[in-house]
Amino acid sequence: MESAKLYINRCLQLARLGEYYVAPNPMVGAVLVQHSAAGDTILGEGWHEQYGAPHAEPNCIRHAEEAHPEGIDYKHCTLYVSLEPCSHYGKTPPCAELIIRKGIGRVVVGMLDPNPQVAGRGVKMMREAGIEVLVGVLENECRELNKRFLCLQEKHRPYIILKWAQTQDGYIDITRETRGDKASTPLVISTPLIKQLVHQQRAENMAIMVGTRTVLLDNPRLLTTHWSGRNPIRITLDRHRVLPAESKIFSNEAPTIVYRENTNWSFILQDLANRNIHSILVEGGTTLLQHILDSGIYDEVHIEVSNIPLPRTANQEPNGVKAPDYTPTTQPKVVNNHQIYIENLHK
């Protein structure tokens, strides 16, 4: 079992190489190992590299055959894969059929695929073909890797991360009214390093969401300017149809979804699930964030707390927007003298 854990852990490392490119598919890695009296030999490795492209298993087998043109004794090999091989025709042929056709003697699977089109059928096909199959090695780690994909499959909604930065005394911004004048300049709370990490978060999630007021006041582009990977799909609300057509959120740099007629949170989540969007990073203001917090439908909360308070007016009265009403229960990490709280509720 220890060697199985070692190889599945390697599968997880490989799977992460496709992190910014395979959504809404899961990240998957595979390792082909030949066993002999002299010990184990890794013949090939592979991962799911691009949405719509070959899966980890055929990539692994192709790599092994290219590296060993003399031929491979598949009967004495074990294929380690972090997620159950698929059993259906989609954008690619079934991986389970390829494994059977190659005559691989043993397969070790990190976790079953909850996709209704698979859901144990891949394992069943391989076992019926006489292949020894072990399931559930490092299952918790495999689930954590693909928490976004699993949320969409099991809860039929996107994985939701709420994020905001606040001052030491609990404000997310100064009070602002309009876009374009000096008074509308937002309060800068995050450090340059943390801003870069936020762009990494944008790349990790399929969509990013802000409210009407954020678009009106900040006119954000909501792209991954400071990180590699795809730009997220942009989502906003415009129930009163007040967003200017020239707003940067409507640029052709990334798709944008605007909810006007129905801004109910449950409806939005169902609609996004129907669009196969498996994750949302919510960077909105207090109104949107508090609405979602009050609904109880979210998975993670990320809060950055600055080491300085809100700038005060001459009479020392705070003139700012209060942060959402939320009390972290975890211990913070300290980055650039700012406290970072990461609350994970999906486990």
Predicted features and spans:
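Short, basic/aromatic recognition patches
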Residues: 2-23, 152
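Short beta-strand scaffold segments in enzyme catalytic cores
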Residues: 28-38, 163-165, 341
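Zn2+-dependent cytidine deaminase-like catalytic core
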Residues: 32-142, 233, 291-293
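Short internal beta-strands
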Residues: 105-113, 209-210, 234-240, 258-260, ...
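Short gly/pro/ser/thr-enriched loop/turn and capping motifs at secondary-structure boundaries
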Residues: 114-117, 140-141, 216, 241-244, ...
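Active-site ligand-binding patch in enzyme domains
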Residues: 151-281, 286-290
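Conserved histidine-centered catalytic loops in small-molecule metabolism enzymes
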Residues: 265-266, 316-347
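Short acidic amphipathic segments
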Residues: 288, 292-301
